[in-house]
Amino acid sequence: MPDYDLITILGPTASGKTPFAAALAHELNTEIINADSRQIYRGMDLGTGKDLADYTVDGHPIPYHLIDIADPGYKYNVFEYQRDFLISYESIKQKGCLPVLCGGTGMYLESVLKGYKLMPVPENPELRARLANHSLEELTEILKQYKTLHNSTDVDTVKRAIRAIEIEEYYAVHPVPEREFPKLNSLIIGVDIDRELRREKITRRLKQRLDEGMVDEVRRLTEQGISPDDLIYYGLEYKFLTLYVIGKLTYEEMFTELETAIHQFAKRQMTWFRGMERRGFTIHWVSAELPMEEKIAFVIEKLRGN
């Protein structure tokens, strides 16, 4: 029987990975560590798909970590994620449990599964000024020239792209110091969802979250003093809803552009996960359409080495 330190559940948006991870954690009497870069933030709930109800299974609350740990407007980074992941991981292991890591942010997942040695990167005003007038397309092309560590799935705004280039430039000049990060042997389970079903679920989920008050959530964040630029930085829902709230898009334009952007994002997530396989990770894929009991049985079999 393989000796795993961790179970990782990954998959694109709307694949049902969170209810799957919660049901598995319930079965194994363990806890979940979040690996979604935007669910880190308090008050950013509907826009990040933070379905906290998923963390209750058969009336039992499943403990979760790294959700609601930073204020909106803050630029949380992968260096901090590694640090916070380790604290959560060790606290779960001390209870004698096998942690479940769940999310779709490829860079966060890979940073802990591979144990990248990272360090905080300061802002570079000169570089920012030089890149300020470039389009997102031009910045993406610049970013492609690096042997990049950066998560291209999240580079969907000019600010994010400039920050990604800033990080790459810094690492090019400053050798990364050795920093201890434990080698983790994770069983990695990928949730495979049919493309058309994924598209249908994304659209249905978007309409549902808009009905539940996603626009009001963005308005509330701006009323709390979060600048439109800071919200746009988070991309996807926050980018397009903010543009609608400040009058730059009509409701119809916002919906159409956001729907398209989420579909593209899910496609980029799958590209990242396939890239992980090329980089040496073994991902055991399970169909999103299987009944929950069968998905859990699949994981239990893999844990036993079958």
Regions from the PLM with identified roles:
Residues 1-306:
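Phosphate/pyrophosphate-binding catalytic cores of soluble transferases and nucleic-acid-acting enzymes
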